[in-house]
Amino acid sequence: METYGLEKLGLVNAGAVYRNLTPAQLVEHALRRGEGTLSNTGALVVKTGKYTGRSANDKFIVDTPAVHDDIAWGKVNRPFEKAKFDAIRAKVLAYLQGRDVFIFDGFAGADSKYTKAFRIVNELASQNLFIHQLLRRPTAEQLRDFHEDYTIIAAPGFKCVPDIDGTRSEAAILVDYEAREVVICGTQYAGEIKKSVFSVMNYVLPKQGVFPMHCSANIGKNGDSAVFFGLSGTGKTTLSADPQRMLIGDDEHGWADDSVFNFEGGCYAKCINLSPEGEPEIYNAIRFGALVENVVMDPDTREFDFDDASLAVNSRVGYPVEYIPNAELSGMSPSVPKTVIFLTADAYGVLPPISKLNRDQAMYYFVSGFTSKVAGTEIGVTEPVPTFSTCFGEPFLPLDPSVYAAMLAEKVEKAGARVYLVNTGWNGTGKRMKLSYTRAMVTAALTGDIEKGEFVTDPTFGVQVPTSIEGVPSELLIPANTWEDKAAYEASCRKLAQSFAENFKKYTHMSAAVVAAGPKA
């Protein structure tokens, strides 16, 4: 039986070994093995059990001399002993002995100058389907000559024993940059595999002069590209799926000297409250070949109830970018971005729904990475919680924030890009901003129409706020207008401004000009 080189990993006695099966074959295997069921649209539907989001506290980086000085150690990048990693790795390989395994050999990085080859070894056919659709798929010729740069082993059925293994729980995501391996066990949430690829790219690309970004990206009809930064649940996927523009990708990109390129070949979209009216591109992508996680489905009709959050608020669907009608299949833009948008979901209700930033403000708000944790994207988050995530992607950034901030500054300046802060969160009415209004504001920024009107300076945040945008009620553009209680509004402004200032104290490397660009408490 062909083993496709698994013995190099130490996996010498697997059951059947399948490599780069088609989606149809993987769906057949998943159904036969009882991993999921089919929906009335043909999508494969699975329940991931206990873990329905990323388990951020269970991720560790192996601390070796070769990488020690590179990593920004702390609450996000937790060190793990090499010997303990090797012990868990050996146990996982022993666990996989005699079991069928599914291999996907593919790529991250659409720009061939920066492409990395990944081998993903899965215990589950459904997870292999997911990563087949999310990464960049090889041609027959590429598969024949394939040599992996990195290997990820995902064995959800293997549970760690914290007292013995040195982990925090039964789940662990262990990244060994020096050995070029990742081991994922105890969690079936497929997003862990995708984000492990992202963490690797965030480590290696800055060394090649490429700025790795937790962002979505699209291209206008004139070839003008735009990038949208933001944490999970702030609207990256939704706002970049624009019928008037070509989608490059929805989550992970690199900004090189002459292009923006997608790391992936697929999308991973939230499903909660999904509707054909609100997000038709995503809704219509839920078909055969897509993997749906934790969406409630009628057992008889097999119809979805996207409004039912009883399985998870963070319900998801993974599908290839080809399922989006206006996708840019090359995964690249012909030019560097002219528009940069920072997305945030402000639970305080005081940030303007859209504002323009100068260079120092762009640095300040990028490094701050303010948003509110939105229910369900991490274990234990059920209500919006104001939070700061460095560079809008702290959980995935192994290097010091100053590395990524300096790269953004350099790229924005070189491209002459305009930077906007867009609040997709709440206002003084206690309601979240309507998607149609946010779309109108983003469109005005992308077309340049926003620059034709007047701007006023926000007294607390110092940003430039437009006074009118077509398709948006003017009273919503100025946050104070949405609050009946002006004293409460001002108190909330002060509270958020103080949070910004307190958070920014840890960035001792930033210039005085950037520090001064923050809100006035």
Regions found by a protein language model. Name each.
Residues 1-144:
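N-terminal accessory targeting/assembly segments
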